[in-house]
Amino acid sequence: MSDISKASLPKAIFLMGPTASGKTALAIELRKILPVELISVDSALIYKGMDIGTAKPNAEELLAAPHRLLNIRDPSQAYSAADFRRDALAEMADITAAGRIPLLVGGTMLYFKALLEGLSPLPSADPEVRARIEQQAAEQGWESLHRQLQEIDPVAAARIHPNDPQRLSRALEVFFISGKTLTELTQTSGDALPYQVHQFAIAPASRELLHQRIEQRFHQMLASGFEAEVRALFARGDLHTDLPSIRCVGYRQMWSYLEGEISYDEMVYRGVCATRQLAKRQITWLRGWEGVHWLDSEKPEQARDEVLQVVGAIAG
C-alpha cells in the first residue's frame, strides 16, 4: 500500500508492552488529552470474575477511561485470536464512526499480530480428530506425538514444547484435517488491518526493574484478596486447568495451591517466576516488531509527551 493511500485510512494507536509496565496508566492519561477510546488487548482481561490476578483496571479507572472488550466471557468459555479480531474490528469501526481514534492497549501480542496482519485460514477444531489425538497421547505419551510432529512439521515442532499439549494437539489436528502443515497455513495471512496505525511499546529500561515491579505487584494482588478471588472460581466446580482462563499466569499457580499440590510459599515463588517468563516472552516478541516506537515506563511524563509528539498531528 502506498503512503498516500495509507494516509487516507482512519487512524489507530497500539500501546503494547510487557505485564507490569504501566500501559494502563499511560492509556488513561492519553485519553484525557487525545480524542481516543480504549480497547483492551488482553486474553486474561476478557474474563468476568478475574479482576485482581489480571490487574484489571479498577472501577475508578474504568469510570475515567472505559475499556472495551473487558469482561466479555465467562471463565468457562474459550476466546480465540479470530474472536478478538472480529470483536476489535467492530469496536474500532464504532469508535471511528463517532469521530474518535481507537487506542488499543494490552500485552497479548498474538492478538495485536492477528489484528494487524490478519489470520491465516486455519481449519476449525474437529472434536473427533482431537479425541483421536488425545487417545493416542494417553496411550503413547505427548513425547511420542511431538516426535510425530517433528516428522510432519519440523518448524512447528521446534516452536512447540512437548509439554504443551494444547498447541501440540492443535498442530497435529490442523494437519490431519487439512493435509497441510500449521507452518504452511500460517504463512498465508489474511486481510491486513485497514487503519493507519501508530505503534508504541512501553517497558522499563532495565530488566531488573521490571522483575522488581512484577514481584511487588504479585504481593499486592495477594494483599488485595487474590486467593479469595481464585477460591470463588475453584468453588464453582466447573472450572479446571485445561481452560485458558485457569491457565492464566498466577491463577494456575494459585489453583495448584488450592488443590494441595504445592505450598503457599511455592505458589508465590512459581507465580512470580511465571509472570517474569511471560514478560520475557512479551519483550522478545516486541523486539522483533517492525515500526514500533519504544517508551521508557520509568519516565511516564516523557512517554506521554513522546506519544503526543508522534500522534499529535492526528488529534485535530
UniProtKB/Swiss-Prot annotation:
Catalysed reactions, semicolon-separated: adenosine(37) in tRNA + dimethylallyl diphosphate = N(6)-dimethylallyladenosine(37) in tRNA + diphosphate
Sequence positions that bind ATP: 17-24
Keyword ATP-binding annotated: yes
Record-listed substrate binding positions: 19-24
EC number(s) on file: 2.5.1.75
Pfam families: IPPT (PF01715)
Cofactor (UniProt): Mg(2+)
Interaction with substrate tRNA as annotated region, ranges: 42-45, 166-170, 247-252, 280-287
InterPro entries: Dimethylallyltransferase, IPT, P-loop_NTPase
Annotated keywords: ATP-binding, Magnesium, Nucleotide-binding, Transferase, tRNA processing
Entry's family note: Belongs to the IPP transferase family.
Subunit field text: Monomer.
Function: Catalyzes the transfer of a dimethylallyl group onto the adenine at position 37 in tRNAs that read codons beginning with uridine, leading to the formation of N6-(dimethylallyl)adenosine (i(6)A).
NCBIfam families found in the cross-reference section: miaA
Name used for this protein in its record: tRNA dimethylallyltransferase
Gene source species: Escherichia coli O6:H1 (strain CFT073 / ATCC 700928 / UPEC)
Gene name linked to the record: miaA
